[in-house]
Design a protein with these regions (language model features):
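Glycine-enriched alpha-helix->loop->beta-strand junction motifs that scaffold or abut catalytic
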Residues: 33, 60, 157-162, 197
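Glycoside hydrolase catalytic-domain groove-lining segments
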Residues: 50-60, 65, 167-197
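Active-site cleft segment of glycoside hydrolase catalytic domains centered on the general acid/base Glu
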Residues: 79-161, 165-187
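Short, flexible, glycine/charge-rich loop motifs used to bind or transfer phosphoryl groups or to couple energy/partner
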Residues: 25-28, 151-153, 191-192
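N-terminal carbohydrate-binding/catalytic regions of secreted carbohydrate-active enzymes
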Residues: 2-94
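A general marker of short, structured functional hotspots
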Residues: 1, 8, 15, 19, ...
Length: 197
């Protein structure tokens, strides 16, 4: 699947309601109907209703990178999370909730405790599954470091979709002796797709 990152286009900067037709306009610009629109969203803030309305108007689904920037301990089975699920359900569109992705990388604050990560992923999944049948839980590690990926897998009951972030990198795991110049990037998917078919 291919997509486009339009968030840095100056026509679409600022509040999402400033350009209420941005997804429809983009579809018209490229002459294609897009199926999914991706947005980053900070855990602890309310469900992005305006964005969901734009996505619905464009005839698509929303992929929401739901990021607990304050750390995993901020994720609780509380009124906030239940309201988020109810608002996601009320959006009336498919929502792919990409919760705390790239967890195997040291650059995110939810890295470092696989047991706690799995508990929090399972918690969010249960609340979404119980309250919002239109929400699919997406587990999405980074392709590197590959050796840590499986430590963070929260289990089949919690994961509806599996994805992977793959970035252009000249070396595997930052090791200059492992050149990736002629490596097919799809081989990175083997780490998860061969284990979790």
């Amino acid at each position: 699947y291919f997509g486009a990152y339009i968030a840095q286009d100056t026509r679409y900067e600022g509040a999402s309601n400033k350009y209420p037709n941005k997804y429809t306009d983009f579809n018209n610009l490229v002459g294609k109907q897009h199926s999914t629109y991706f947005v980053y969203h900070k855990y602890g803030t309310e469900f992005p209703k305006a964005v969901a309305e734009q996505v619905k108007a464009a005839g698509g689904a929303l992929q929401l990178a739901f990021e607990p920037d304050e750390g995993l301990n901020s994720v609780q089975n509380d009124a906030y999370l239940k309201q988020f699920a109810q608002d996601a359900k009320a959006s009336g569109i498919p929502v792919f909730l990409r919760y705390a992705s790239e967890m195997n990388g040291t650059w995110v604050p939810w890295n470092g405790n696989p047991t706690l990560y799995k508990q929090k992923f399972q918690l969010v999944a249960k609340v979404m599954h119980d309250n919002a049948p239109n929400v699919a839980m997406v587990w999405s590690p980074n392709s590197m470091p590959a050796e840590k990926v499986h430590d963070y897998y929260p289990g089949d009951a919690s994961v509806d979709w599996l994805g992977m972030s793959i970035y252009s990198n000249p070396f595997n795991n930052g090791n200059v002796s492992l050149n990736t110049e002629n490596v097919n990037p799809l081989t990175f998917l083997d780490t998860v797709y061969n284990k979790y078919p």
